[in-house]
């Protein structure tokens, strides 16, 4: 039997992605949005779609989306900008609750 050559396993690089909310004039145009990123959610009633796109080419993509005829406005998600360390908030809330209990 031939010996099996060991191939080098390349690491999986996770690209940074960001949420983009695209508000449309009608529901018909939302099918075309899959060209620009991964369509995660589409609302027929509110006429908006949620896309996830790579963070690298965000500025070019936003200008392309705004130029489409059926697009009303484009918003970028801000979850990366928020502080996701909630331990301090919990500690402050616990102190406030303890102070209220002591007052009673």
UniProtKB/Swiss-Prot annotation:
Its main location: cytoplasm. It holds the Pfam family DUF2129. Keywords: Cytoplasm. The keyword Cytoplasm applies. It is found in: Cytoplasm. InterPro entries: DUF2129. GO terms for cellular component: cytoplasm. Belongs to the UPF0298 family. This is UPF0298 protein YdgE.
């Amino acid at each position: 039997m031939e010996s099996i050559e060991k191939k080098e396993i390349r690491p999986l690089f996770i690209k940074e992605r960001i949420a983009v909310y695209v508000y449309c004039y009608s529901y018909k145009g939302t099918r075309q949005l899959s060209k620009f990123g991964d369509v995660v959610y589409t609302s027929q009633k509110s006429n908006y779609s949620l896309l996830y796109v790579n963070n690298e080419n965000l500025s070019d993509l936003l200008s392309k989306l705004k130029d489409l005829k059926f697009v009303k406005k484009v918003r970028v998600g801000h979850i990366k900008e928020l502080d996701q360390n909630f331990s301090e908030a919990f500690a402050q809330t616990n102190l406030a609750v303890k102070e209220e209990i002591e007052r009673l």
